[in-house]
Regions:
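Donor nucleotide-activated moiety binding/catalytic core segment of transferases
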Residues: 34-57, 76-135
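Glycine-rich phosphate/pyrophosphate-binding loop
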Residues: 1-58, 200, 204-208, 213-235
Length: 235
């Protein structure tokens, strides 16, 4: 519905706009951490620039709705004081104790991926959703809850979740986002099932089918070229 904002013709691919190829060194998916912790660990490994006040308000609401839950925030500069203090101030205003928040900075990529074995549910920021971050969480067996908007940047996770076959994790708005997260946090059987099945499901999905993506993309590019050569409008 955003075609009117583009000066060029928008061409939509049938599945997604990227193909994800997981790194060979990605750790094995671990058991659901809830079973060893006895509480839910939420996580977001997104750029702190994406985590605005509205996002923090919603996440604070979630933490207050899921007793004893924690939130692990990780990014290369997430442990910088200016980022930590901004988030702590907002979350504290909602009654979230600082002890429930963990801020982690830069690490090797393999260690970042391994950290997902301590996360039960990943929280997607909005209106700028995760892209590669969402793919990595899913590959590590961690479900991601997202709320898409109208812009391309706000619909990355929507695309990935749809292509993997779990559109039920896509919320219709902030309130529905909270409801979906809280509901999933209280459904340990569902979380356990996702943990054990998500990587295989993703591996077999359109999101990880590089050959199909390459075939579709090159076909579209050839069609664009042929249309240009014939002086036709690209469709």
């Amino acid at each position: 519905g955003a075609e009117r904002y583009y000066s060029e013709e928008v061409i939509r691919l049938p599945d997604g706009w990227i193909s994800y190829a997981p790194p060979s060194y990605a750790p094995d998916v671990g058991f659901l951490p809830f079973h060893r912790n006895g509480f839910i660990n939420f996580g977001s490994f997104n750029n702190p620039k994406k985590i605005n006040e509205s996002v923090l308000d919603v996440w604070a609401n979630i933490l207050m709705s899921v007793p004893n839950s924690r939130l692990i925030l990780k990014y290369q500069n997430m442990d910088v004081e200016i980022n930590k203090n901004r988030m702590i101030d907002i979350m504290s205003a909602h009654g979230v104790e600082i002890s429930r928040l963990t801020f982690e900075g830069r690490s090797s990529h393999v260690d970042l991926l391994a950290r997902y074995n301590d996360i039960d549910i990943a929280l997607d920021p909005f209106p700028y959703s995760g892209g590669l971050t969402t793919c990595e969480a899913l590959w590590m067996g961690v479900p991601v809850i997202t709320v898409p908007g109208e812009t391309f940047a706000s619909r990355h996770s929507l695309s990935h979740l749809s292509n993997v076959g779990i559109p039920e994790l896509v919320a219709e708005g902030p309130e529905d986002y909270i409801c979906k997260v809280v509901e999933l946090a209280n459904d340990i059987a569902r979380l356990t099932d996702l943990r054990s099945s998500l990587r295989d499901q993703m591996d077999k999905s359109a999101l990880c089918d590089g050959e199909k993506f390459a075939s579709v993309f090159t076909t579209v590019v050839r069609q664009i070229w042929n249309s240009w050569c014939l002086g036709e409008r690209v469709k």
